Amino acid sequence: MERLKRAAAIHDISGFGKCSLTVALPIISAMGIEVSVIPTAVLSTHTGGFTGFTYRDLTGDMRPIAEHWKSLGIKFDAIYSGFLGSVEQIDIVTDFIDDFKEKDTVVLVDPAMADGGKMYTVFDMDFAKQMTRLCAKADIIVPNFTEAAFMLGEEYRPAPYSKEYVESTLRRLSCLGPSKVVLTGVAFDGRQVGSASYDRSTDEISYALSDTVDGYFHGTGDVFASALLGAYMNGLSLAESASIAVDYTHGCIVRTKEAGTDLRYGVDFEHGIPDLLRQTGII
C-alpha cells in the first residue's frame, strides 16, 4: 500500500453553513488525500446571509502551528489556501509556502476576495495587490473574473465573455507567476457556466461547462477547488481535473435546488462523493 499523499489546507472554519474547511476536509480526504489544517478563524456561521455570527480570529496561532509542524519534519504534497482575512495572514501563508514547498509540492491558491465586480466589504484594493503577491508563489490559481480583473489592475467585465477575452485573461494571469490557471464563472451565453483552464507548460486551454442553475449557492467555490485539487493529486491533468470539478459542483447545486434547501446552508456535496470518486478513477 502506497503512503497517503498529504495536503495542508489553510482556511477558516464556519461551524454551520458548508464552506471553507468544512468542505475542503471531507472532499479531499474522501479522494484519498490526508489533510492537515491550519484554521485562520472560527465562525459560528459563514457571513453570507447570516447575522449575529460569532468570530474568533486565529492569526496569532498560524505561525506557531507551522513552526511546530516544521520541528516535526512534516512534509506536504500540496498546499491549499482559501479565504484569508488580512494581509498578515497572506504574509504567513507566503512564509509557509517558502518553508514547506519542495520540488514536487503543488501549491493551489484560491484568491477568495471578490465577486460580482466588487471586493468583499472587509477588503480594499491594496489587498488585491497583496493577494497577487501570494498567487505568484502558486502552481495553480482558481480566481473568478472579478478577482482576475482586480489582480490584473483592470476594470471588471460582467458575462457573457468572448473566447478571446477569456484566453487573454488566462495567459495574463499566468504571467503573474502561476504556471496553471483555472478561471471560474466562464459564460459565453446565459445557458451554461463553468471554467476555463490554462497550462503554460503545454499552452493548452480547455473549457468545462454545465447548464446554468438560477440562484446564488454558498460554498461552491470551495467545493470546486477542493475537487479540482483532489483530482489533480490523483494524477489527472489540469483539464481533466477541472472538468470533473465542474461536473461535481453542478451536481451539488442541482441536488440542493431540488431538495429546496435554504441556500445559505451550503450545497449537498455529500451525496455526490461516490460519483466523484468513480469519475476520478479512485473506485
Regions found by a protein language model. Give the residues of each.
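Short pre-catalytic strand/loop immediately N-terminal to key active-site residues, enriched for Gly-Thr
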Residues: 15, 205-218
